[in-house]
């Protein structure tokens, strides 16, 4: 760096007192959020910028977002979400000298405007009553006072935790997961007719019609061939039946989870590239960056279609629920007193 008597020289490329380029840090974080591993980024910097940077340095740079992750994870939430979805993603994390499978649970809340927000991420070795009690308490402590429906995949201990935290909320088994579980043991060539037959169950206008459709499937050739598919629905029947009380538009919000499924698909793709994570914090950091990256792309696409500027509010915001206006009106009819409290 040149020296001058008055000390007025200010470098443009590397400001005084800094050791790294902030633009380079941003690029490394962007590559990491895009799904590249630390070794991939090291190779990329070496080949494109002829820069030799150690994996530890790259990891330290990406750790700079941990404070943002904690702020996001502890942020205040809306007091009411008409619908909350809970879904899980399996990740491999090192535990000493072995690699274990852990579940990363994601809560997605649909607000009064139909916008889907990721409320939080939690990594756990196994689910249970105490775990779900802590998750519900976390959401409640951050401001969530009520939800009409909590939609999940028959998670153990969750109904009890929801009833203790939000006594008026209804726990609903996720229809998408039920369909997937019913098709798990079905051969590929039979999946289409089995799915078509089971569609008569979850699109039935009443509980009696749905039960008759399931009985008819059980008595059919396909039902006798795949009794496990019938058992899946029988076992989940008590948690499935409340779904039938809603009109079609509200039902579509509950079983149309395309945006959540597509988000999970992209997260699975990125986690497969990494193989395994050194610890829970690294997994949480990586998933948060991936979600930000994915939702930023979606927001840019929506803004381009609407020909308007992107509004950055510091939150991870997803797509709008399909047919929401009709659905929220139907939910308002189903829960008139509670709905009026949050207008």
From Swiss-Prot:
Q: InterPro entries this protein is in?
A: Transposase_mutator
Keywords of this entry: DNA recombination, DNA-binding, Transposable element, Transposition
User: Does the record's keyword annotation contain Cell membrane?
Assistant: no
| GO molecular function annotation | DNA binding; transposase activity
One of its GO biological process terms is: DNA transposition
For the keyword DNA-binding, the answer is: yes
Q: Which PROSITE patterns match?
A: TRANSPOSASE_MUTATOR
Listed Pfam families: Transposase_mut
Query: Per the similarity annotation, which family is this?
Result: Belongs to the transposase mutator family.
Q: What does this protein do?
A: Required for the transposition of the insertion element.
Give the NCBIfam families listed for this entry: transpos_IS256
User: Could you tell me what this protein is called?
Assistant: Probable transposase for insertion sequence element
